[in-house]
A protein has these predicted regions:
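N-terminal Sec/SRP start-transfer signal
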Residues: 1-12, 23, 285, 294
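Internal alpha-helical transmembrane segments of multipass membrane proteins
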Residues: 2, 244-264
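Hydrophobic, regular-secondary-structure patches
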Residues: 15-90, 100, 114, 213-215, ...
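Juxtamembrane alpha-helical signal-transduction segment immediately C-terminal to a transmembrane helix
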Residues: 17, 21, 25, 238, ...
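Hydrophobic secondary-structure segments that place a key small or acidic residue at a functional site
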Residues: 85-96, 104-185
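Mechanotransmission and gating elements of multispan inner-membrane complexes involved in transport
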Residues: 148-153, 159-243
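Transmembrane alpha-helical interface segments in multi-pass membrane proteins
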Residues: 251-256, 266-268, 274-319
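Conserved transmembrane alpha-helices of multi-pass membrane proteins
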Residues: 310-314, 324-337
Length: 337
């Protein structure tokens, strides 16, 4: 029975994690067609720019970013700038139209009006206890171990309603805010062409541009263009084999548990011959005695499966809870291994 419980627990957790992870990746992509960023791993670019899991591949010129947004193939484009965090929640420098991607709505406060003001996601507000008009300082890097920018604190001016996407775990501010902390102030005042951003989130006017636009960027610039849907499909193709292996192992464990239950029943029959003989003398037929033994085995199997399903749900919820505490989220920011 213990093997049955173990096998069903593993199967339940595997199925839940696999399905929830797929749903989460789908929800976190607001129908973006392509991401443009520094050359490197396309998957890394997608994970860092949309799902905010991996580290960025580097920075690109803000001047080039503006030119790409003006390209005839592009319907919508917004730059983002990464590099800092607060208590492991990433700080994203961007433009106000970024919120349109997620149909985000302000619950309290408003969107920033000047640099060093920020809007925080639903989970950020709950976890950090930040409120409107409160100040906080970001840490350099994407985990909460870097140098603190104590000289330039952020002010919370808005809190977003819950979206069920990665936006709930982000701190959103203006590009100017990020540049003030990492660039020369004279460059911001005089000319922004020398400044940099991390990536561009883009939508096409026409889906046929998916064939020509990435090739144009990848061949003719020092940047790369990556398709979110394509890269995530590749990712799940790779991880799918691991899930299959886990499920096969679970099925093997469950099968062994059935064999174990069978041997247990046979052993019980041998040990309970006297009891069975009494049943025979009381008028029980062989078929009825066999059905009693069969029901006993099915009951053990059912209980093992049921307990395994319950344990699987408990294990999954525990993983989800502790993942949320660590900001490596199954429901928004799943930490890949």
């Amino acid at each position: 029975m213990l093997l049955m419980i173990l096998g069903m627990t593993i199967i339940t957790v595997s199925i839940l994690v696999n399905q929830i992870t797929k749903d989460t990746f789908n929800k976190n992509n607001p129908n973006l067609d392509v991401i443009v960023g520094a050359k490197g791993s396309p998957l890394q670019l997608v994970l860092s720019s949309i799902h905010h899991i991996d580290i960025p591949t580097g920075n690109i010129s803000y001047k080039n970013a503006k030119n790409i947004i003006k390209h005839p193939a592009i319907k919508f484009g917004v730059p983002i700038s990464l590099g800092d965090n607060f208590q492991n929640f990433r700080i994203v420098g961007t433009e106000k139209k970024f919120f349109k991607l997620y149909n985000a709505q302000i619950e309290t406060g408003s969107i920033w009006r000047k640099p060093m003001q920020s809007v925080i996601g639903f989970n950020v507000a709950n976890s950090t206890k930040l409120k409107i008009d409160k100040f906080f300082v970001g840490s350099h890097g994407l985990i909460d171990t870097g140098d603190v920018h104590a000289e330039q604190p952020y002010k919370v001016v808005g809190v977003l309603k819950k979206t069920g996407t990665i936006l709930d775990n982000l701190i959103i501010t203006s590009l100017d805010s990020v540049w003030l902390l990492h660039s020369n102030k004279n460059d911001i005042k005089n000319s922004r062409d020398s400044l940099e951003v991390t990536a561009l989130l883009l939508k096409y006017k026409n889906k046929t541009s998916a064939f020509s636009f990435p090739r144009l960027i990848n061949r003719n610039t020092n940047m790369q263009a990556a398709s979110p849907n394509l890269e995530i499909s590749k990712l799940f193709k790779l991880t799918g084999e691991a899930y299959k292996a886990i499920n096969y192992l679970s099925i093997l464990i469950v099968s062994l548990s059935f064999v174990g239950i069978l041997f247990t029943l046979l052993n019980n029959i041998s040990e309970r011959r006297y009891d069975l003989a009494i049943l025979r003398t009381l008028g029980f037929s062989k078929e009825k005695i066999f059905s009693i033994i069969l029901i006993e085995g099915m009951t053990i199997s059912f209980l093992g499966s049921f307990i395994g399903l319950i344990f699987g749900g408990i294990v999954y919820k525990s993983i989800e809870y502790f993942s949320l505490l660590g900001k490596n989220i199954i429901a928004g920011q799943f930490e890949l291994i």
